[in-house]
Amino acid sequence: MEYNKQMYETLVAIRATAQKLNKELESLTNDFKRIHAINKELKQKKQLLEVFELYDKLVVSGLEAEKIINDNAMKEFHELAILDLDAAKEQIPDLEEKLKVLLLPADPNDDKEVIVEMRPAAGGDESSIFVGNMFDLYKEYCSKHNWKINVIEMLPTSVGYSFISFEINGEDVYSKMKFESGVHRVQRVPATEAKGRVHTSTITIAVLPQQDDVEIEINPADLRIDTYRASGAGGQHVNRTESAVRITHIPTGIVAACQEGKSQIANRETAMKMLRSKLWEAAEKEKNDALSALRKNQVGSGDRAEKIRTYNYPQNRVTDHRINMSLNSLDRFMMGEIDEMIDALRSKEQEEKMKLIMNE
């Protein structure tokens, strides 16, 4: 029976490593950094090992069936063995393809929750309005995935928003939302346009994986923390108390602020989350700037300046330029039905990883 022996041996070794990690985890009590690292590694390997368990059973079953078929002393079992062998041969190729994908290097941030920042770019009022439209899209998308949105900062204008930041909490959020980083272009006729001309405007979206304090260490001495009165809707409470918090990381000049929480403590916690994510982003940018152009051209590079998508309202079409994919269902897309596009982007990302491995 044919099967990928090299891959099988690799997976046996991965399973053995996971078993060792589980044993180590049982003996750990106070080393929280190590506990965190082990749990993260085991979570990343969970799906791979689940598929391998089925694959392993089929390989063992197929090999045993072959032995029975080749043993004339066991002729009475040949018919059953042939059925087992045929079942193994039928399922093994598909499982091997799944395992090849699962063996690709995982993005270490895929299982993380995220912080999203949205800003108008070119296009004046239309750009500000589209920031609000995209926020509504993400609210619907999060609802479909049972993710929770928590607004960090929301700065309204007369027609839209000059800035919105929010966190998304749930399972494997970054693995899907990371593809939303970049410049989003909208083409439509503004409500104020008397001659019916189509205007083009853009907004920028940044998606940052939330970083644990275990992963991003910050020296408290490097921080300046300011409090101020929150602006915007909120009644008398907004005007009386300095609940908004702004944290500046002095060595880098990076600033994170939050004013939407119910208390100064809650806003400070959220601002620290944002700061950790922004420091991670700055470190990643520095690292990636040193890499070849190959990585920069990859899907999901997260470059804020990359024009990734066009929303054409007159033609009810949305186009993702990274994969040259168009959907003639912009109306449904704007209601949060974006998984078809996201799944295509994830598949492209996996293809690129596979190509890199093949070329090494």
From Swiss-Prot:
Pfam families: PCRF, RF-1. One of its GO terms (molecular function) is translation release factor activity, codon specific. Keywords: Cytoplasm, Methylation, Protein biosynthesis. GO terms for cellular component: cytoplasm. The modification N5-methylglutamine is found at residue 236. The keyword Cytoplasm applies. Its main location: cytoplasm. Methylated by PrmC. Methylation increases the termination efficiency of RF1. It is found in: Cytoplasm. The keyword Protein biosynthesis applies. NCBIfam families: prfA (TIGR00019), PRK00591.1 (NF001859). Peptide chain release factor 1 directs the termination of translation in response to the peptide chain termination codons UAG and UAA. HAMAP family: Rel_fac_1 (MF_00093). Belongs to the prokaryotic/mitochondrial release factor family. This is Peptide chain release factor 1. It comes from Mycoplasmoides gallisepticum (strain R(low / passage 15 / clone 2)).
